[in-house]
Amino acid sequence: MSRAESSWERLVNAALRRDRTGGVAGGNQSSIVGYVPSSLSNNRDIDAILRAADEIQDEDPNIARILCEHGYSLAQNLDPNSEGRGVLQFKTGLMSVIKQKLAKREVGTIDRSQDILRLQEFYRLYREKNNVDTLKEEEKQLRESGAFTDELERKTVKRKRVFATLKVLGSVLEQLAKEIPEELKHVIDSDAAMSEDTIAYNIIPLDAPVTTNATTTFPEVQAAVAALKYFPGLPKLPPDFPIPATRTADMLDFLHYIFGFQKDSVSNQREHIVLLLANEQSRLNIPEETEPKLDDAAVRKVFLKSLENYIKWCDYLCIQPAWSNLEAINGDKKLLFLSLYFLIWGEAANIRFLPECLCYIFHHMVREMDEILRQQVARPAESCMPVDSRGSDDGVSFLDHVIAPLYGVVSAEAFNNDNGRAPHSAWRNYDDFNEYFWSLHSFELGWPWRTSSSFFQKPIPRKKLKTGRAKHRGKTSFVEHRTFLHLYHSFHRLWIFLAMMFQALAIIAFNKDDLTSRKTLLQILSLGPTFVVMKFSESVLEVIMMYGAYSTTRRLAVSRIFLRFIWFGLASVFISFLYVKSLKAPNSDSPIVQLYLIVIAIYGGVQFFFSILMRIPTCHNIANKCDRWPVIRFFKWMRQERHYVGRGMYERTSDFIKYLLFWLVVLSAKFSFAYFLQIKPLVGPTRMIVKQNNIPYSWHDFVSRKNYNALTVASLWAPVVAIYLLDIHIFYTIFSAFLGFLLGARDRLGEIRSLEAIHKLFEEFPGAFMRALHVPLTNRTSDTSHQTVDKKNKVDAAHFAPFWNQIIKSLREEDYITDFEMELLLMPKNSGRLELVQWPLFLLSSKILLAKEIAAESNSQEEILERIERDDYMKYAVEEVYHTLKLVLTETLEAEGRLWVERIYEDIQTSLKERNIHHDFQLNKLSLVITRVTALLGILKENETPEHAKGAIKALQDLYDVMRLDILTFNMRGHYETWNLLTQAWNEGRLFTKLKWPKDPELKALVKRLYSLFTIKDSAAHVPRNLEARRRLQFFTNSLFMDVPPPKSVRKMLSFSVFTPYYSEVVLYSMAELTKRNEDGISILFYLQKIYPDEWKNFLARIGRDENALEGDLDNERDILELRFWASYRGQTLARTVRGMMYYRKALMLQSYLERKAGNDATDAEGFELSPEARAQADLKFTYVVTCQIYGRQKEDQKPEAVDIALLMQRNEALRIAYIDVVDSPKEGKSHTEYYSKLVKADISGKDKEIYSIKLPGDPKLGEGKPENQNHAIVFTRGNAIQTIDMNQDNYFEEALKMRNLLEEFDRDHGIRPPTILGVREHVFTGSVSSLASFMSNQETSFVTLGQRVLAKPLKIRMHYGHPDVFDRVFHITRGGISKASRVINISEDIFAGFNTTLRQGNVTHHEYIQVGKGRDVGLNQIALFEGKVAGGNGEQVLSRDVYRLGQLLDFFRMMSFFFTTVGFYLCTMLTVLTVYIFLYGRAYLALSGVGATIRERAILLDDTALSAALNAQFLFQIGVFTAVPMVLGFILEQGFLQAIVSFITMQFQLCTVFFTFSLGTRTHYFGRTILHGGARYQATGRGFVVKHIKFSENYRLYSRSHFVKAMEVILLLVVYLAYGNDEAGAVSYILLTVSSWFLAVSWLFAPYLFNPAGFEWQKVVEDFKEWTNWLFYRGGIGVKGAESWEAWWEEELSHIRTLSGRIMETILSLRFFIFQYGIVYKLKLQGSDTSFAVYGWSWVAFAMIIVLFKVFTFSQKISVNFQLLLRFIQGLSLLMALAGIIVAVVLTPLSVTDIFACVLAFIPTGWGILSIACAWKPVLKRMGMWKSIRSLARLYDALMGMLIFLPVALCSWFPFVSTFQTRMMFNQAFSRGLEISLILAGDNPNSGL
């Protein structure tokens, strides 16, 4: 054996050992081969053969060897040269296994005929050993018996495994043997027929009907299957067309044949259509015929829903649909069309993002099919003519001929986007291709495709073009140019409105004393020119923005753009001309003034008329009726482009009035604030400044002096104008928060917010549950009589109990409660003989003992009853004990004993009735009775033994003695002593000697419950103690009282899928990951044990370990696996998500199981998970698909993620995994890559079993990864709805019970249109980890609850935000899917689903009676990356056509709602920061120009009201107060007022204002940079547990350009203002005006270190400094990353500046840094009063000298290696000369020391400005050879900035209390729960097991 083979064999053996030892933990991988390479996987026999070999290798290694050899020969035949990826390794490994088996075999040559005989003999032996003939019959008998036990499950698994092995053995025999004995051949065929259910299927076994799957027995499924069968009108299929023997041909087989669809795609869509039809039928009625038939109504509804978009498309293009008359089409034809559409959609791959393209394809294929339908025999369609005329099983004719040409051009364009770096205008995205089909021009493409059309023209790759500009076909109808002008282009109505209102308010403010004069009237009339000029600006932008799309855009659309341009151009010129002439007119009666008024009136009237006609909902019908008039149609077309999307986006009148009133209130507040506090106070100062003609300027002024001091006025008004633009968002936030609070209160949110409330209201829960979550019952009456109410309460409790108990059990399984707490919380079945309701023990515990004390202390019966009835649960406890004890005793005792008990109870009843209880019984001795009864019950609850029987008799006799001697009074005692029968039995010793031991389960449960009631002494007021368990129970019980749609039965509910995209995140923590320590000595497991100590103890108890056990004590595989799951369920892992989502299936099984049972049995949930009918019903209604994009590659690379995913499939039988399989196979001597979309499930051997494999036209990832991942797998989803779930989300069993209620919202009235997206509330479960996590959690919670509540209603503008919303699945899959995928522009892919829905006349709602868990980022760096990603995504949204169309086509008030809750929020955030800059640069101008001092001297600005108002508004926005307002109101609503105040104050102590200010900078930087330069990309933020210390250099790299540089600029401005613009009397004024700016700067500089764990520990700080200096001075190079070298990082930071426009913008923005030098040099004492420009010129000479000195001292050591001494001499001499020059200047000239510092202050920003401009023009500087000098300068600046930040951190680290405070501040929540964060951070791990 060669060395390579030997090494490979060792690797294989190691892998085999790992697989065997990790069997439980990692899934049952085959021990012969773990993975068959994808290039061989198309032959599925290999995998099956190797599995069979694995199965039998222990029984007969020789047979296993034969199978392995056959598998090897198949692999060799498929790929003889081993060219496929992984094939060589696979074959080598398999050969080594074969050689091992041969080595163990007896010596001799291999006789193939002998092997065949052995194989035949083994087949017979294997059948006999496993009792094959009786195996299936035994399972059938077990199943029919209804005994759903583990035995049944075991039998089923065994049968499947045996028959799967037999099938492989028979198949191999048939392939190896030339002849097989006839008898054996018959047996093999018979066994193969019995192995039918080993054939892979998804939900319904349509191609292989099986007896073990109950879905096929449902009448609605049978009806749906029957409806698809071949009908008489269909041409006959060729006789050789393969149809499975287990079913007859259907219409999908017909379509498969004529169009060449793929076999698996047809099978997939067959099941899809069957389920759609069956579920629709079940909602109408259940067919009861012998041969069930579908109702026409069900077919019609599915047909219209699925083809609604196609019908609208035909209507839009004014073409006849594929049918002439819809009503004339019969059901069979509708199903044929429906099947064709879904087959097209199912195989369309990336073309699914082009819904109207699919309409085009469907339109032509239907017409082509109609031609074929006229024939007798089916023939392949010309457009999809397969190579094999019979229609191959795996034919891909449709894929090759229809989809591939489209995919080819789409992929070519996508490749040309240069991985997202190319401008959007340079390539066609998905929307461009789709919108081509919005015009009749698309029909020029013909059918079959005319591939010579320019539409199919592929661009020349950019890399092959020297200029870098690719020739390409133009964009379609919209071009995403990268510019801020899109904000005006899309929302021009808002900006026009704000500008005109500002102008009007200013005119009123300046003329407030003379509002009725002609002058004022003419000024107000200036609004006319303002309007038309701004409209003209918008039309100019339309012309500019369409550049790049003119050649391909419809001529009509282009004509409209230029008509509008001409119209508004002429209107603006004409109206402006008239206005100017009116100003010169002598009086108001002048003809020109009158003409102007008439023109304005007409123009305004027409504008107003069409606004009403097209924007007001009630006028839409009128507008549509007016379309027959050409003039009206023309004006409507001119005013609003008629796109396919965006039509009819109006709401009903009542909804319109609601959001209109909301915005009127907001706008009234906003403009009142603007007028009284912003504009009006500036009127006087403005007039005075304008009048000042002799203001001395201290510098050389160019602009302001001779122009009414224009720049001074601008510096005064600029911050006010900035705040004017953004404060509307402030008022929106405040009013929406209060409205959301009121709406939440109306919806009854937060009514149950404590355990006390649960206790108090528990008796109302059963009734509320029956009303809200249970289907109506016939035996539940509405009669209100006392007896009927009691009966109804009993029925309600009985039906509520199984659901409540399952909730409690799930809490225990999740380790949130202890076993004892579970016992207290569980509710009795309430279905027994007791007529009263039995409540859970946690309500009744200790109540009996308290009642005993009350009875002993009270003096009368009335007092006893009055005191007991004060507490309802005490009353219930007493009643239950009283009646239950009687039942137990009478059932246990016989003869005289039973008579005695009955007599006692009769006497008690008589005494109570006569109110003589105190006279007849000595209640002060009740404790004696309770003691004896408790002793008796303690014995009876055990199993019967002779000793227990004696003990019970003794206890009864003691009880008898106590009753006779102690309890009964003298009078009552006499009655019993004279009772001869009893006395005789007692005297003879017969009394109580015969006992009937309680063996009945119900009676035994009563005994145990009674015992608990007597023995539990502690109050259960704090049960459960776990905060998460409390929260969940509180929310669930609260939701029972909310407005929930009444549910339908599971059978009639809407079906749905859950869909989770996954890439490579953590699936399940391994033990290595859990126990690995970080640099602080902390492991994940140790962290979790400290964070969740109670849950850790509960876990140990659940697996049967002592609570002090260490993880090292868990030595068996089962416990280790449970530990891995326990830890994973507390992280943000796929395992947690899968567990949560599979609760849907569990809930549906429970609901279905109980609904199917009748009478009292309907309350017994025992065995519901084993019921085949319940499982089948749940599978029909629920599907869970996780789309693991690279699962195939992970399997191939044997990644642990693949093993863990397989394990999840084993544990969750309904879980389906979809993935993209990349198959590298040789073709014509070259490696050819093919892509398949595959769906797998777990099989009986624990491996994944392929269900469907659908070939794709190419690599599916053409755009953004996540939506492409979703798109390829969406074909495997099922149902009417689909819930999008991220892999960091969770779900809860109690919430899953409400899913069918939520789905009923689709049929509820939510406006003029039915809902298409149902919004779902989220709970952020990571909020308790740290203060940062709580900030994010609270911020997120306020948005997903209060914020979205208002957006949905009344604003009617809620979108989809990537949260767990439920989509109308059919609506969305026929309209482009649940997300958009174009590269970069759709980086925030989820929100575009909401945009698309709204544009396509959908409706998005929000519902808060159900919630889903969600994890959030918990570290500052994670949060910053996440917020940067979202801000960048919003920057891209600004450029998108969706935002443009929504901004243009929504009515004005919905448009404002849309703007301020999407991109407007980020614009206002950016304006908040810009306001600081505007204010400070304005103050710097006043200070440096000298104007500020003059103004102060002349007391012009005595009133700072406007500026103060502006700065206060900015500061409040800055520190997050308007994030906090919704948060606080949400707290008040759901936690109560006091707790809300405590939470808010706590947040302030935790420095939440610093965090929100810091976040402001993050959003501003990424939003602005994305619009300017692009560069938005998906950020993998990481979802781990963050308690580790972040290094200084890492923080510096992340925040240097986004925060630190900007903070330094703010500080420079503040210092300049302090130095030159402030006098001694103005100190208070300076502080008041600049406090927000100082706070912002300090927050931006030091927040990363304040929120850095151990950020102020001295040792860490020292290590950080060393690491930072190493990074700073380490030179970069090829392959060096930014984390390793400053140079590499610096180059990365400049990579986003790529375009000429970007370089110009950066240059313009950088010019601001030169203001410092220009202003400061004129303030130097050296220049005196000279204000000539020469002073500024000499300052540049000085700066040049400094640069020369810098170059001298940074001269390259490599270059100077030969003249080091000379260089040192020159450097020393230069330094001495510089110092001497400064000293001489200070001594001999007016230059002062302060002037030197002033020069430093001036030159630092100048240097940075030069550096910024140089970076923008990097290619030019490189060609000039100056780049190294620039890099040296940049390093110096970063070094200085780093030191300025580092010094305060180091200083604080000297004081230990700072570190203590920081730890307390960061982890306060953890401390409040008794956590040991200080121990965690110190790394003092006491756990020896780690």
UniProtKB/Swiss-Prot annotation:
It is a multi-pass membrane protein. Its EC number is 2.4.1.34. One of its GO terms (molecular function) is 1,3-beta-D-glucan synthase activity. The keyword Membrane applies. One of its GO terms (cellular component) is plasma membrane. The chain crosses the membrane at residues 490-510, 524-544, 561-581, 592-612, 659-679, 723-743, 1458-1478, 1513-1533, 1540-1560, 1610-1630, 1631-1651, 1704-1724, 1733-1753, 1769-1789, 1796-1816, 1839-1859. GO terms for biological process: (1->3)-beta-D-glucan biosynthetic process; callose deposition in cell wall; developmental growth; generative cell mitosis; microsporogenesis; pollen development; pollen germination; regulation of cell shape. Disruption phenotype: Plants develop deformed or collapsed and inviable pollen grains. Keywords: Cell membrane, Cell shape, Cell wall biogenesis/degradation, Glycosyltransferase, Membrane, Transferase, Transmembrane, Transmembrane helix. It is found in: Cell membrane. It catalyses: [(1->3)-beta-D-glucosyl](n) + UDP-alpha-D-glucose = [(1->3)-beta-D-glucosyl](n+1) + UDP + H(+). It comes from the Eukaryota. InterPro entries: FKS1-like_dom1, Glyco_trans_48_dom, Vta1/CALS_N_sf. Gene3D superfamilies: Vacuolar protein sorting-associated protein vta1. Signal peptide: none annotated. The keyword Transferase applies. Residues 1-489, 545-560, 613-658, 744-1457, 1534-1539, 1725-1732, 1790-1795, 1860-1890 are cytoplasmic. Residues 511-523, 582-591, 680-722, 1479-1512, 1561-1609, 1652-1703, 1754-1768, 1817-1838 are extracellular. Belongs to the glycosyltransferase 48 family. Involved in sporophytic and gametophytic development. Required for normal plant development. During pollen formation, required for the entry of microspores into mitosis and microspore symmetric division. May be required for correct temporal and spatial control of callose deposition during pollen mitosis. During plant growth and development, callose is found as a transitory component of the cell plate in dividing cells, is a major component of pollen mother cell walls and pollen tubes, and is found as a structural component of plasmodesmatal canals. PANTHER family: CALLOSE SYNTHASE 9, LYST-INTERACTING PROTEIN LIP5 DOPAMINE RESPONSIVE PROTEIN DRG-1. This is Callose synthase 9. It comes from Arabidopsis thaliana (Mouse-ear cress).
